[in-house]
Amino acid sequence: SLASFQSRKGTALDNFSYKAEAQVASNFKKLSLNAEYITYYAPNRRWTMRVFAGTFLSNNANDNYYDFNVSRVNDYLFQYDLYGRSEAEGFFSQQYIKAEGALRTTGNLTSANQWLMTAQSATTIWRWVEGYAEIGWVKSMHQNAETHWGTGITFNLVPDFFEVHFPIYNSNGTVFTNNAYPKNIRFQLSLRPASLAKLFSRSWF
């Protein structure tokens, strides 16, 4: 079963939103909270801050299917516009969904079966170019908590609708030195009516 509560306050230029969620199944119980603040401090210049925290009250699952995901959501409840659900490689496997941990890069940390906390911030550098920084703390059962952080550039072509993320440096080192760098590029694309509504409410400012 699923229970959730969400709220959004403010205007198109300065707003705060949050969502609290509880999931209960025969083999797990978990709680999560997601909060985001967005402000346009000058014409076409914005600053965003997002935090996520999730914990299992109990977890008897035999695999990681219901884990909190650090970067790529599993979306077993079909809540998001995830276009490559079964893809482990290729273009659609690099889709970025701003849900759960929502880090752009993760290294070897992919999910957490005990608790997960992440924080992300981004600000406009020039027009539709943003710089971002993010950090996450990942804890799975019988393992020590681990930390992963990263920085990069986002081409914010259409806010919350079409964005491309280019990691630059993270806790594993300089991403650009990796020959497989193109696989680290993430794209965000949403065709949901709610996203389109937010697009038109902001595009006039």
Region spans (language model):
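Generic beta-strand/beta-sheet core signal
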Residues: 52-54, 132-134, 156, 165-167
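Membrane-spanning beta-strand positions in outer-membrane beta-barrel proteins
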Residues: 46-48, 128-130, 161-163
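Outer-membrane beta-barrel "beta-signal"
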Residues: 155-161, 181-205
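Flexible, surface-exposed loop regions and adjacent strand-edge segments
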Residues: 65-72, 146-148, 181-186
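Strand-loop-strand
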Residues: 146-176
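Conserved C-terminal beta-signal and adjacent last beta-strands/turns
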Residues: 117-122, 135, 151-156
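Long, low-hydrophobicity, solvent-exposed regions enriched in small/turn-prone and acidic residues
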Residues: 127-129, 133-139
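C-terminal outer-membrane beta-barrel translocator/porin domains of Gram-negative envelope proteins
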Residues: 1-124, 141
